[in-house]
Amino acid sequence: MSEEKPKEGVKTENDHINLKVAGQDGSVVQFKIKRHTPLSKLMKAYCERQGLSMRQIRFRFDGQPINETDTPAQLEMEDEDTIDVFQQQTGGSRVASCLLGSGL
């Protein structure tokens, strides 16, 4: 029976996952998070560390937006996976305005 305790310890260790958060500037920040912890915790910690507002940026994994309630387990994330961070764009671009204005 005493052999089961180390197995529990291994299970606890496997409950954590190391994730990388990659910014558009090439910076990478690493986080260790439990597989069933909402990613909002990681997102808020990243914003605090980088001096950003949650309203300024968007997080994506495998090209799909991440919701604050998503967990690594739900998104089937694996150890050392990368989350991409993008600054939210506000308004239209000059090119789009020019194209729309020209009737194209």
Swiss-Prot record:
One of its GO terms (molecular function) is ubiquitin-like protein ligase binding. Disulfide bonds: none annotated. Interacts with SAE2 and UBE2I. Covalently attached to a number of proteins. Interacts with USP25 (via ts SIM domain); the interaction sumoylates USP25 and inhibits its ubiquitin hydrolyzing activity. Interacts with BMAL1. InterPro entries: Rad60/SUMO-like_dom, Ubiquitin-like_dom, Ubiquitin-like_domsf. There is a cross-link at G92 (Glycyl lysine isopeptide (Gly-Lys) (interchain with K-? in acceptor proteins)). Belongs to the ubiquitin family. SUMO subfamily. Ubiquitin-like protein which can be covalently attached to target lysines either as a monomer or as a lysine-linked polymer. Does not seem to be involved in protein degradation and may function as an antagonist of ubiquitin in the degradation process. Plays a role in a number of cellular processes such as nuclear transport, DNA replication and repair, mitosis and signal transduction. Covalent attachment to its substrates requires prior activation by the E1 complex SAE1-SAE2 and linkage to the E2 enzyme UBE2I, and can be promoted by an E3 ligase such as PIAS1-4, RANBP2 or CBX4. This is Small ubiquitin-related modifier 3. The gene is SUMO3. It is found in: Cytoplasm; Nucleus; Nucleus, PML body. It holds the Pfam family Rad60-SLD. There is a cross-link at K11 (Glycyl lysine isopeptide (Lys-Gly) (interchain with G-Cter in SUMO)). There is a cross-link at K5, K7, K11 (Glycyl lysine isopeptide (Lys-Gly) (interchain with G-Cter in SUMO2)). Residues 15-92 form the Ubiquitin-like domain. Its main location: cytoplasm. GO terms for biological process: protein sumoylation.
